């Protein structure tokens, strides 16, 4: 049996990670996501190169929360490397980490221009399902890397186990 509550929490957290990674890249001049870990109650993202101050963290969370209050669709599709690279810079998608022999990739896309990234994970279908993003800590991981930990507030809408929108 699938624990729907836990699965759905992971879907929300994972989508929030994509959102935060995409926003951080745009807001902070190409900062990259170099690691992440998704849990059902909190998650973390490692960014590099960056040294966040509180103003920067506030800007990141407020930008994320502005979007999670909007009905922005999240889709999955199969794309070629060339199609992905034509839309997003290779360093943003971490395409260099994938074997060159992999030609077609599953991608998650948030809205038209929020984020597009190769990913085989599970995600919600709309940003309104994520809830508010609350950054709860930051920690230096050395060599210009900072770890940001976040949790999520209640979403505007949810999906029940039988896929009804509530």
Label each PLM-derived region with a short phrase.
Residues 1-166:
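Active-/binding-site microenvironments in catalytic and ligand-binding cores
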């Amino acid at each position: 049996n699938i624990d729907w509550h836990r699965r759905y929490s992971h879907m929300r957290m994972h989508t929030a990670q994509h959102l935060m990674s995409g926003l951080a890249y745009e807001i902070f001049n190409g900062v990259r996501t170099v690691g992440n870990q998704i849990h059902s109650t909190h998650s973390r993202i490692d960014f590099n190169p960056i040294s966040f101050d509180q103003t920067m963290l506030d800007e990141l969370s407020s930008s994320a929360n502005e979007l999670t209050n909007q009905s922005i669709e999240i889709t999955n599709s199969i794309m070629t490397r060339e199609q992905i690279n034509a839309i997003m810079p290779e360093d943003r998608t971490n395409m260099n980490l994938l074997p060159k022999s992999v030609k077609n990739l599953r991608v998650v896309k948030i809205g038209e221009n929020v984020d597009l990234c190769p990913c085989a994970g599970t995600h919600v279908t709309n940003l309104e399902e994520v809830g508010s993003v609350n950054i709860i800590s930051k920690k230096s991981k050395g060599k210009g890397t900072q770890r940001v930990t976040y949790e999520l507030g209640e979403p505007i809408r949810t999906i029940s186990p039988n896929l009804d929108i509530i």
